[in-house]
């Protein structure tokens, strides 16, 4: 990685804070590049004896092109490179939030010579190119911004603090040590003592196992990062909408005693034990002549196909019916599912239990109800939450320390595969130089994770997924 700022011909600018009409007390317009200070001095009028000193906040006004009209009252901060986020000269203009003030300030900045609008993720990309961040830290910042739960934010912060970088760099250095031993034997075997191939191979196997464990852990971490989609399915009037409202802690869906009340797919975003979950209340699935209701049923099938887990709700007071069995058969075999008996409050628990056993019998291939609950009273709610998290493997994600994103997972897996090929070369007693081929590939893959071995074209593709202003 480069440790001194890379010269960029253009200075970039963008709004670095979320902006919505009428929302937000303040917003930040960020500039980075060689003209940042000049542009800041041009658009911001600083009264009195205040001096433009690095890392000192100044008070002033953004003026229009004529210098007569005040566009906004602002605070401005100059950060001279390399002591800035990007490693370049950076100016941040803190103006009032909302829409119009921010837009006018940004337009005033972009009207200056040698300034253009920043591309998505371009500030972070410059930080990586200038050695202020490694690639895993930059990606972790993006994940921190997008985090939908406290646990996801904590996991992202570990990456921001360099947790992923340290882990990957340590593994890569261990491989580099082994590669240096091998290459020395290839070039100067006569001058060196014999190499213990078994010991070297054991070290490569240890690194491979650690990489495979990182990939396995990361798959569980995806649950915290991406969340789960849980589809509530069942016949009309079994209490799906009541269950959605219960879990959402608000009246998200209309609830009546009339079958077919829900005619579209309703969604509710919640967080359960640190896991972001999208609850999808589907229209009751049944045969119908109502075109509007049928449209809702079609969308229910689409929601089911996109779900991570299906919660099939049936009415305990009516028992398991042929329609329930038909719905169960429509759930894809590879989709995790839970059978949930609702309306347990309508009869004593002992009656509900006996009704469950008697009604299910062999009609569901020996499967029993996973949870009995009452969406009305909340009875069984905690059991349902635990069952959903366990079914999706989310419970196992709670203890993770670091979790690779998908790009990092793919590269770690590629490194592990390359090390497996190295082991095959050893088993076939191939010469040392055959070992080095795949070992170099593993080292290269790990270098791509941290950005030590990566092209700017690949960086462009990675950072294009970031938000503008980051």
UniProtKB/Swiss-Prot annotation:
**Where does it live in the cell?**
Cytoplasm
Instruction: Give the first-level EC class, as a single word.
Output: hydrolase
Q: CDD domains, from UniProt?
A: trmE, TrmE_N
Q: Which residues form the TrmE-type G domain?
A: 227-393
Citing just one GO molecular function, the answer is: metal ion binding
Coarse class of the primary localization is cytoplasm
EC number per UniProt: 3.6.-.-
The cofactor required is:
K(+)
Q: Which UniProt keywords apply?
A: Cytoplasm, GTP-binding, Hydrolase, Magnesium, Metal-binding, Nucleotide-binding, Potassium, tRNA processing
Q: Name one Pfam family in it.
A: TrmE_N
Which residues of the sequence carry a binding annotation for (6S)-5-formyl-5,6,7,8-tetrahydrofolate? Answer: 30, 92, 132, 470
Residue sites binding K(+) per the record: 237, 256, 258, 261
Q: How is the cofactor bound?
A: Binds 1 potassium ion per subunit.
What residues does GTP bind to? 237-242, 256-262, 281-284, 342-345
Q: Which residues bind Mg(2+)?
A: 241, 262
Q: Can you tell which superkingdom this protein's organism belongs to?
A: Bacteria
Q: Which processes are annotated in GO (biological process)?
A: tRNA methylation; tRNA wobble uridine modification
What does this chain do?
Answer: Exhibits a very high intrinsic GTPase hydrolysis rate. Involved in the addition of a carboxymethylaminomethyl (cmnm) group at the wobble position (U34) of certain tRNAs, forming tRNA-cmnm(5)s(2)U34.
The text of the family note is: Belongs to the TRAFAC class TrmE-Era-EngA-EngB-Septin-like GTPase superfamily. TrmE GTPase family.
Its subunit composition reads: Homodimer. Heterotetramer of two MnmE and two MnmG subunits.
This chain belongs to the protein called: tRNA modification GTPase MnmE
Organism, by scientific name, is: Prochlorococcus marinus (strain MIT 9313)
């Amino acid at each position: 990685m480069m440790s001194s700022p890379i010269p960029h011909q253009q200075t970039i600018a963008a709004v670095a804070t979320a902006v919505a009409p009428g929302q937000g007390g303040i917003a930040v317009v960020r500039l980075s590049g060689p003209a940042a200070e000049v542009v800041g001095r041009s658009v911001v009028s600083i009264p009195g004896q205040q001096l433009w000193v690095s890392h000192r906040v100044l008070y002033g006004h953004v003026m229009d092109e004529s210098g007569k009209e005040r566009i906004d009252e602002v605070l401005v901060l100059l950060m001279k490179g390399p002591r800035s986020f990007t490693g370049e000269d950076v100016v941040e203009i803190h103006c009032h939030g909302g829409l119009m003030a921010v837009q006018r300030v940004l337009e005033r900045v972009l009207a200056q010579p040698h300034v253009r609008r920043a591309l998505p993720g371009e500030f972070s990309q410059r930080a990586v190119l200038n050695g202020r961040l490694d690639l895993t830290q930059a990606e972790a910042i993006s994940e921190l911004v997008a985090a939908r739960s406290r646990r996801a934010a904590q996991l992202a912060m570990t990456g921001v603090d360099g947790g992923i970088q340290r882990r990957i760099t340590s593994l890569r250095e261990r491989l580099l040590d082994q590669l240096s031993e091998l290459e020395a034997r290839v070039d100067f075997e006569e001058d060196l003592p014999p190499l213990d191939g078994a010991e070297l191979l054991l070290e490569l196997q240890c690194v491979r196992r650690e990489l495979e464990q990182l990939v396995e852990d990361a798959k569980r971490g995806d649950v915290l990062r991406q969340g789960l989609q849980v589809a509530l399915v069942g016949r009309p009037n079994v209490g799906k909408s009541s269950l959605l409202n219960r879990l959402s802690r608000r009246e998200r869906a209309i609830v009546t005693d009339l079958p077919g009340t829900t005619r579209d797919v309703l969604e509710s975003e919640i967080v359960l034990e640190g896991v972001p979950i999208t609850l999808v209340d589907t229209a009751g699935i049944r045969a119908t002549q109502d075109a509007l209701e049928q449209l809702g049923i079609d969308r229910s099938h689409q929601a089911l196909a996109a779900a991570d887990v299906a919660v099939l709700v049936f009415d305990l007071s009516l028992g398991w019916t042929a329609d329930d069995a038909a719905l169960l058969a429509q759930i894809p075999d590879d989709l995790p599912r839970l059978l949930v008996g609702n309306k347990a409050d309508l009869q004593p628990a002992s009656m509900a239990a006996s009704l469950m056993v008697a009604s299910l019998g062999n009609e569901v291939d020996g499967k029993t109800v996973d949870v009995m609950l009452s969406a009305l009273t909340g009875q069984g709610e905690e059991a349902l939450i635990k069952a959903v998290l366990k079914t999706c493997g989310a419970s196992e994600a709670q203890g993770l320390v670091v979790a690779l994103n998908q790009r990092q997972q793919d590269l770690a897996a590629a490194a592990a595969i390359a090390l497996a090929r190295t082991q095959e070369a050893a088993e076939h007693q191939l010469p040392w130089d055959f070992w080095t081929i795949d070992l170099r590939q593993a080292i290269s893959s790990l270098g791509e994770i941290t950005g030590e071995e990566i092209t700017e074209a690949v960086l462009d593709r990675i950072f294009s997924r970031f938000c503008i202003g980051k």
